[in-house]
Swiss-Prot record:
Top-rank taxon: Viruses
Gene3D superfamilies: 1.10.287.2230, Alphavirus E2 glycoprotein, A domain (2.60.40.3200), Alphavirus E2 glycoprotein, domain B (2.60.40.4310), Alphavirus E2 glycoprotein, domain C (2.60.40.2400), Trypsin-like serine proteases (2.40.10.10)
Stated consequence of mutating W264F: 73% loss of cleavage by capsid protease
Effect of C745A: Loss of palmitoylation
Annotated stretches, region: Disordered: 1-106
Positions with biased composition (Basic residues): 67-106
One GO CC annotation: host cell nucleus
Name this protein carries in UniProt: Frameshifted structural polyprotein
Organism, as annotated: Sindbis virus
Ranges where the Peptidase S3 domain occurs: 114-264
C-alpha cells in the first residue's frame, strides 16, 4: 500500500540498505558456450588479450634511466648596436582609453536599440534620431538619413521653432521606445559621455566632454526615462552649457538655448588655409610654432592678422603639435608679449615720468563697482614669460632695461581708498574700487616704490532702485552686468606690434678718449657710428669702437624681434602705424545677477478714488507712479525716512513701484450707499450717489407719469360713478343695489346725513355722541401704530445719507457695512 503511494512521489518508501548490510548473492554460473562457433572464438580471443594487457600492467618494471640534460645552445654574440642619436624622437605611447563609468554603461545599454545614427551621403555619422513615446524624433539641423531600413522611409513633420522633426514610430517598435518625464529636479543625470549637471534651469557638462556629432542624444534619469534631448552647446569656460529640448508638466515642449550655442551636427568642416609668403598651409597646422622659431611665428601671425581663422592659428602657434601635451598654465597668448616703459602723467602725484606700470586705459562699465585696468606691466608671469600665478614682470628703469619680476603682493591699486584685486592676466587687472577722481597703480617693494596715476572719475554705482554702499547679504537678485573673472573669456582684441629699436646712451661708454659698446649681460646690441667712416656692428660683450673718441659720434640700440608689445603711443611704431598683431582682451562684460536690498513694504490705506502710502526706509529709495490710461503722467521721487504720499486713483488704474518691490496696480471700483437690488428707496438712494443727474431725471419722469396716470384714473372713475348713479337719481324713492352702492360709495337708501345724526345724538344721548366721534380717532391711532411697527423693517438696510460714495468691498450692506478696501 505504501509502495504505491511513495512511487507516486518518485521515491522509495524506505532508504536502500548500505552495502555492508546487503545479503550475499549467489555467484551465477558461467554462461553456457554458445553453439555458434565464430562467436565463441571471438569471446576467447578478447579474454586472452585482456589478460595479457592486465598482466603487463601489474608486472613490476625496472625504472627507466633519466635522460641527460640538454646543453643550452649559445647564441653567437652580436656586435653592439650603435646608439641612436638623441635627436631621434621616441614613439609616443598610445594612452589607453578609460573604461566607461557606470553612467556611461547605463546610457550605452539603453541607447542600443532606441537610438539610431543619422548619416550623410558619405556615410559619416552626423547626429542621432531617438525613438520615444510612439515617435521617432530627430534634430532639424541634422541633415541626413536615419541608418535604419524602415525609419529612413518615414515622412517627418518639421518644427523650426523647436529645431526638431518627428514621425510616427512603427507599431512593432513602440514597445522598445524610450519614455520621457517632465520631472527633472536639480542634480546629476546620465548621457552618452557620463554625467550631466542640472542646476539653475540649465544642463551643463565639463568642457570638452561633448561636441559635434552628439546632436539628438538623450539625457536620462536613473530610471532610464528621457529628461531632455541635446541639440548643441555653448562654451562657458570650464563648463559647457547644453542647448536642449525638455517638456513641462502639461506635456508642452520647451527649448532652452544658452547664449553662444553651436549646433552639434557633425557637418564636414572646411579647413581654413593661411598664408606665409606665397605658401599656403592649414591654419590649425602651421609650419612652426613660437617655442621653436619665435620670430618666424610672429611673422606668420602678422601676415594673417585679419584672417577669419586667426584664433585657430594663434592657438596652433602657441601649442606645438610635437611637443606633447601643452599646458595652459604655462603657455598662453601673452607669452608672445613683453612689458614696456611708458610715459605716465602723474608719478607719485607730482610730475610726468617713464613708468613700468603706466596706465593705458581704465574701464568701469560693470554695475558692481568693478574696474578693468590696462598697464604696461604684465601680471601672472615670471621673468622668462612663463605663466606664474603669484608673479608679475616689468621693464626695469635701470640702464640695462631688462625684464624683472616680483610678487603680486607688491601690486597696490587705489582710488579714493584701497581697492580689492579680483583677478589679473597679462597687461590687465580686475579690481573693485571705491568712488574716486583718479586711479593709481603702485609697485611697493622693500627696495623702492613706483606708481602711476590716471585722472579718471570712478562714480558710485548701484543696481536697482535703492541706493546702497555695500551689497547686502540678503535681499533680491536682479539682472546686472559684471566682468567675467575667467581668464579664458575674451572681450575683443588689443592691437600689438614689434617695436622699433630704442637707442640708449647707457649702452656706450667713454674711457681715456676711447668709445666702448657695453651691452647688457646676455644681450646683443647694435651700434652705428660716424667716425670718419660709417661703422656698424652687433656685439654681445664690451667692445672698443675703433676710430671714435666721443659718445656723441655713436648710437647703440637693442632690438628684440621675438616679442610683441601693446600698440602704445609712447613707443616707436612701424612705418604704416597699422596693427601687426592682436591678442584677446580678457575679462568680458557678461550679464549676471546682483544682490540688492529690499525696503520695507509700504502700508497702503484705500479711500474713495485715492490711496495713501505710508513709507519708511533708512536709505534712499525710489518711488515711481504712472497712470494706466491714455495719459500716464509719470512721477519719480527719492525718499528716505518716514513719509506719506497720497495718489488719486481713477477708473483706468494707477501703478506704483516702491524700491525693488514688484510693481503694484490699483483700480477704483466705485460704489455708493443703498442697494441696487433692494427696496425702491434703496435703489433710488444707490443710483442717486452713483449718477445723480440721471437718477433725478428718471425719478421725476416716473413721478410725472404716475401722477398723470392717477389723475386720469380718478377722472375716469368719477365719470363712471356719475353715469352709474344718474338713472337712480332721476327715480323718486329708488333703491340702489347693494353691490353698486359699495362700488360707488353711496347709500343704498335714504337716511339722515352725518351732521343730522350727530346733532340728534348730542341732543338726546351725549355718551353715544362721544363714542361715535372716537371711532375715527381710534382708527387713526391703530393706523399710526401699524406704521410705527413696519417702519424699522422697511428702513433696516438704509444707510445714513451723509456717508457718500466709497470703494465697495462686498455686494450687500448686511455683510460688512464698515470695512473698505
Amino acid at each position: 500500500m505504501n509502495r504505491g503511494f511513495f512511487n507516486m512521489l518518485g521515491r522509495r518508501p524506505f532508504p536502500a540498505p548500505t552495502a555492508m548490510w546487503r545479503p550475499r548473492r549467489r555467484r551465477q554460473a558461467a554462461p553456457m558456450p554458445a553453439r555458434n562457433g565464430l562467436a565463441s572464438q571471438i569471446q576467447q580471443l578478447t579474454t586472452a588479450v585482456s589478460a595479457l594487457v592486465i598482466g603487463q600492467a601489474t608486472r613490476p618494471q625496472p625504472p627507466r634511466p633519466r635522460p641527460p640534460p640538454r646543453q643550452k645552445k649559445q647564441a653567437p654574440k652580436q656586435p653592439p648596436k650603435p646608439k641612436k642619436p638623441k635627436t631621434q624622437e621616441k614613439k609616443k605611447k598610445q594612452p589607453a582609453k578609460p573604461k566607461p563609468g557606470k553612467r556611461q554603461r547605463m546610457a550605452l545599454k539603453l541607447e542600443a536599440d532606441r537610438l539610431f545614427d543619422v548619416k550623410n551621403e558619405d556615410g559619416d555619422v552626423i547626429g542621432h534620431a531617438l525613438a520615444m513615446e510612439g515617435k521617432v524624433m530627430k534634430p532639424l539641423h541634422v541633415k541626413g538619413t536615419i541608418d535604419h531600413p524602415v525609419l529612413s522611409k518615414l515622412k517627418f513633420t518639421k518644427s523650426s521653432a523647436y529645431d526638431m522633426e518627428f514621425a510616427q514610430l512603427p507599431v512593432n517598435m513602440r514597445s522598445e521606445a524610450f519614455t520621457y518625464t517632465s520631472e527633472h529636479p536639480e542634480g546629476f543625470y546620465n548621457w552618452h559621455h557620463g554625467a550631466v549637471q542640472y542646476s539653475g534651469g540649465r544642463f551643463t557638462i565639463p568642457r570638452g566632454v561633448g561636441g559635434r556629432g552628439d546632436s539628438g542624444r538623450p539625457i536620462m534619469d536613473n530610471s532610464g526615462r528621457v529628461v531632455a534631448i541635446v541639440l548643441g552647446g555653448a562654451d562657458e569656460g570650464t563648463r559647457t552649457a547644453l542647448s536642449v529640448v525638455t517638456w513641462n508638466s502639461k506635456g508642452k515642449t520647451i527649448k532652452t538655448t544658452p547664449e553662444g550655442t553651436e549646433e552639434w551636427s557633425a557637418a564636414p568642416l572646411v579647413t581654413a588655409m593661411c598664408l606665409l609668403g606665397n605658401v599656403s598651409f592649414p591654419c590649425d597646422r602651421p609650419p612652426t610654432c613660437y617655442t621653436r622659431e619665435p620670430s618666424r611665428a610672429l611673422d606668420i601671425l602678422e601676415e594673417n592678422v585679419n584672417h577669419e581663422a586667426y584664433d585657430t592659428l594663434l592657438n596652433a602657434i602657441l601649442r606645438c603639435g610635437s611637443s606633447g601635451r601643452s599646458k595652459r598654465s604655462v603657455i598662453d597668448d601673452f607669452t608672445l608679449t613683453s612689458p614696456y616703459l611708458g610715459t605716465c602723467s602723474y608719478c607719485h602725484h607730482t610730475v610726468p615720468c617713464f613708468s613700468p606700470v603706466k596706465i593705458e586705459q581704465v574701464w568701469d562699465e560693470a554695475d558692481d563697482n568693478t574696474i578693468r585696468i590696462q598697464t604696461s606691466a604684465q601680471f601672472g608671469y615670471d621673468q622668462s614669460g612663463a605663466a606664474s600665478a603669484n608673479k608679475y614682470r616689468y621693464m626695469s628703469l635701470k640702464q640695462d632695461h631688462t625684464v624683472k619680476e616680483g610678487t603680486m603682493d607688491d601690486i597696490k591699486i587705489s582710488t579714493s581708498g584701497p581697492c580689492r584685486r579680483l583677478s589679473y592676466k597679462g597687461y590687465f587687472l580686475l579690481a573693485k574700487c571705491p568712488p574716486g577722481d583718479s586711479v593709481t597703480v603702485s609697485i611697493v617693494s622693500s627696495n623702492s616704490a613706483t606708481s602711476c596715476t590716471l585722472a579718471r572719475k570712478i562714480k558710485p554705482k548701484f543696481v536697482g532702485r535703492e541706493k546702497y554702499d555695500l551689497p547686502p547679504v540678503h535681499g533680491k537678485k536682479i539682472p546686472c552686468t559684471v566682468y567675467d573673472r575667467l581668464k579664458e573669456t575674451t572681450a575683443g582684441y588689443i592691437t600689438m606690434h614689434r617695436p622699433r629699436p630704442h637707442a640708449y646712451t647707457s649702452y656706450l661708454e667713454e674711457s681715456s678718449g676711447k668709445v666702448y659698446a657695453k651691452p647688457p649681460s646676455g644681450k646683443n646690441i647694435t651700434y652705428e657710428c660716424k667716425c670718419g667712416d660709417y661703422k656698424t656692428g652687433t656685439v654681445s660683450t664690451r667692445t672698443e669702437i675703433t676710430g671714435c673718441t666721443a659718445i656723441k659720434q655713436c648710437v647703440a640700440y637693442k632690438s628684440d624681434q621675438t616679442k610683441w608689445v601693446f600698440n602704445s603711443p609712447d613707443l616707436i611704431r612701424h612705418d604704416d602705424h597699422t596693427a601687426q598683431g592682436k591678442l584677446h582682451l580678457p575679462f568680458k562684460l557678461i550679464p549676471s545677477t546682483c544682490m540688492v536690498p529690499v525696503a520695507h513694504a509700504p502700508n497702503v490705506i484705500h479711500g474713495f478714488k485715492h490711496i495713501s502710502l505710508q513709507l519708511d526706509t533708512d536709505h534712499l529709495t525710489l518711488l515711481t507712479t504712472r497712470r494706466l490710461g491714455a495719459n500716464p503722467e509719470p512721477t519719480t521721487e527719492w525718499i528716505v525716512g518716514k513719509t506719506v504720499r497720497n495718489f488719486t486713483v481713477d477708473r483706468d488704474g494707477l501703478e506704483y513701484i516702491w524700491g525693488n518691490h514688484e510693481p503694484v496696480r490699483v483700480y477704483a471700483q466705485e460704489s455708493a450707499p443703498g442697494d441696487p437690488h433692494g427696496w425702491p428707496h434703496e435703489i433710488v438712494q444707490h443710483y442717486y450717489h452713483r449718477h445723480p443727474v440721471y437718477t433725478i431725471l428718471a425719478v421725476a419722469s416716473a413721478t410725472v407719469a404716475m401722477m398723470i396716470g392717477v389723475t386720469v384714473a380718478v377722472l375716469c372713475a368719477c365719470k363712471a360713478r356719475r353715469e352709474c348713479l344718474t338713472p337712480y337719481a332721476l327715480a323718486p324713492n329708488a333703491v340702489i343695489p347693494t353691490s353698486l352702492a359699495l362700488l360707488c360709495c353711496v347709500r343704498s337708501a335714504n337716511a339722515e346725513t352725518f351732521t343730522e345724526t350727530m346733532s340728534y345724538l348730542w341732543s338726546n344721548s351725549q355718551p353715544f355722541f362721544w363714542v361715535q366721534l372716537c371711532i375715527p380717532l381710534a382708527a387713526f391711532i391703530v393706523l399710526m401704530r401699524c406704521c410705527s411697527c413696519c417702519l424699522p423693517f422697511l428702513s433696516g438696510c438704509r444707510r445714513l445719507p451723509g456717508e457718500g460714495r466709497r470703494l465697495r468691498t462686498c455686494d450687500h450692506c448686511s455683510k460688512c457695512a464698515t470695512d473698505t478696501v
